[in-house]
Amino acid sequence: MHALLLARAGINVVVLEKHGDFLRDFRGDTVHPTTMRIMDDIGLIDEFLTLPHQKVDHIAFDGDGQLRTFGDLPLSRQRRANHLYTLICEEPDFLDFLAEKAERYPEFTLIRNAEVTDLVLEGHQVTGVRSSAREVRADVVIAADGRNSAVRAASGLQTAGESSPMDVLWFRLNRRPGDPNESFAVLRRGMLLAMIHRGDYWQVAHLLPKGTGAQRGSLDAFKKRLVTARPQLREHVDDLHTWDDTSHLDVRVDRLKTWWRPGLLCIGDAAHAMSPAGGVGINLAVADAVAAANILVEPLRTGSLSDHHLEAVQRRRELPTKVVQAFQVFLQNNAIEPVLSGDLSPIKLPFFVGRWPLKFIPPIAVGRGLRPERVHTPDVH
């Protein structure tokens, strides 16, 4: 998104992508109204909505064998007309879409199979990166390479961490006739599953107590636990043939103390790793990208970029990041961890989250966003 906005504004930009494509399993896929507004700002909302997606207007859960609805998300008729709703869209499709639109601009270059290995320095100033494909020099390097950012690791920037009581085991199960037509959570004492509707399959997030993700044991025993939690999965679990059909995510909630150094700016998960709770990660990353473009385009155009501009991006985006992370940590410690440890009855969890003032936070965070960004950069073409 950041590269698209720069190229759209007439700024030359090179994107280095580690892989040959964006087809990574179990990436973020929840697109909030704040991101939908941004797509509308740049005139791409109608084309974006032609991608496969599912609308989300409420939260459903199975706490006792029955599927129940809890917590409506903002989805009035007017909001539908203005595309202000939440949807689930596969991130590889989203990234391919943005890359395709960016490639319309001559200022945009995407180099695939180019893994960044180090920074190029002149004194303390970052002047480019070295990759497996080539060395690239730039007025500013934007690190948007995720929670395991190689650029961040090479930068020497310091991280401040928040504790997380959980890890996630991701896997997919094919949908069967009669399955629910909505995403939902399965809540049992000692177990939490998020069943994400992905069209012809379920993307399943199995939340685990921290540090237990690698203690896999018997796959058959694991499948039996899933069926015990939700008997309707009896046929679905046959789609798991080996542990290689699963992917372990070490959940971290952390952020850089300083997002920049001369010539370098970190955004998205490279600046602040988020918990998967709430599906906010991709939306905060897009907001970072838009804010960075709004602040950096003019100094890049005039050759007046300074540390002040990089610091301004952090100043703009740090507060919403801290607020969302604090809420994620609160939910992890006071709702998710007690269910996983067996201390909280799962049937009580939705009512805990629904208590005032917690019940007002999801609609505000999802519907309006915390310090929402709008595109102010021009299209010079």
Predicted regions and their residues:
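Glycine-rich FAD pyrophosphate-binding loop
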Residues: L5-R27
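Generic enzyme active-site microenvironment
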Residues: V15-L16, A143, I267
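A conserved short coil-to-beta-strand element within the FAD-binding core of flavoproteins
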Residues: R112-Q125
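C-terminal helical "tail/cap" subdomain of flavin- and related membrane-associated enzymes
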Residues: N294-H381
